[in-house]
Amino acid sequence: MKNGLIIINCIILTIGTCGGPLLTRLYFTNGGKRIWFMSFLSTAGFPIILIPLLVSFLSRRRSNRNPNNAENKRKTKLFLMETPLFIASIVIGLLTGLDNYLYSYGLAYLPVSTSSLIIGTQLAFNALFAFLLVKQKFTPFSINAVVLLTVGIGILALHSDGDKPAKESKKEYVVGFLMTVVAALLYAFILPLVELTYKKARQEITFPLVLEIQMVMCLAATFFCVIGMFIVGDFKVIAREAREFKIGGSVFYYALIVITGIIWQGFFLGAIGIVFCASSLASGVLISVLLPVTEVFAVVCFREKFQAEKGVSLLLSLWGFVSYFYGEFKSGKKVVDKPQPPETELPILPVSDYVA
């Protein structure tokens, strides 16, 4: 069951990590200018989580109605989350909303390749925060993975200069760069914070509960961005922006908006799902290894240059990915193969022929 969840979360995280930045950049390069609106879309797809939550609720209710179930008289809860976990999820959600704005601001003015490069630096900080917050244990394989991925991202930086879009001013480029750096640092803190929340929760953390946590986090993040949209007046100009969109007009615009919200939801759900199934470091490693893949898609979709350094970075990232998960496989195998202590047998007592 756990292996299946890991595979599912890896797939949806892959789709979200690669697709989210590309769709967001597509919006900004074709007439879209609403940064708060894009921040809103990053988590606005949370209602789709209600589908698996409904399935989980119906399954629990069916189980409680089973006459063989000792707890069949207890009323089935619609939500499993208790108040302390609810409050913690809101706080993390507000931080996520802020992170969404910072990242969307960066994507508005930076090429996908550059923003991916900057976001990739979160791995080193993710490892640091994981060590400080949840006492993450490092193995030679995980250390090797962090070093390889960090070096790969550093190689990408060799040709990051000179990629400023022609339509952007120097000030916009620099501010976008700094915003993306802060976004990387903040999300590197958020992932271990989610793992710490799991560990400190006073209730059993199950995958349905993880879905509830994700929904509350996204609801809080979306509310944060809605306030920003009201302040800057985004709601008043969306219809006009749709009509003036350069590709496909209003129909394509609204289709892009819906798909972007769904894809980004996959990113966040996959990220915290891997934190649940493995660790925050594992989630950070997978996100980092997918960044060069996003670079390749950016080259194809936006005709960004693909220098030799990007190819080397891609190979190093794949090497780091294999190194990390090979180490996890070996650690798991050692636990399985560890000899169990023999059962203690009671001594055989002599049977006396004497009958009282």
UniProtKB/Swiss-Prot annotation:
Recorded GO MF terms: purine nucleobase transmembrane transporter activity; purine nucleoside transmembrane transporter activity
Location in or out of the cell: Cell membrane
Residue stretches making up the EamA domain: 35-158
Regions that span the bilayer: 4-24, 35-55, 78-98, 114-134, 138-158, 174-194, 213-233, 256-276, 282-302, 311-331
Tissue note: Highly expressed in leaves, stems and flowers, lower in siliques and not detected in roots. Expressed in the epithem of hydathodes and the stigma surface of siliques.
Taxonomic superkingdom: Eukaryota
Keywords on record: Cell membrane, Membrane, Transmembrane, Transmembrane helix, Transport
Regulation affecting activity: Inhibited by diethylstilbestrol, N,N'-dicyclohexylcarbodiimide, carbonyl cyanide m-chlorphenyl-hydrazone and 2,4-dinitrophenol. Competitive inhibition of adenine transport by isopentenyladenine, cytosine, cytidine, hypoxanthine, kinetin, zeatin, nicotine and caffeine, but not by zeatin riboside or kinetin riboside.
GO biological process per UniProt: cytokinin transport; purine nucleobase transport
InterPro entries reported for this sequence: PUP_plant
GO cellular component: a single term: plasma membrane
Entry-linked PANTHER family: OS09G0467300 PROTEIN-RELATED, PURINE PERMEASE 1
Functional note: Proton-coupled purine transporter mediating adenine and trans-zeatin uptake. High affinity transporter for pyridoxine involved in the uptake of vitamin B6. Also able to transport caffeine and adenosine. May be involved in the uptake of cytokinin, caffeine and nicotine from the xylem sap into shoot tissues.
Protein name: Purine permease 1
Name of the gene encoding the protein in the UniProt record: PUP1
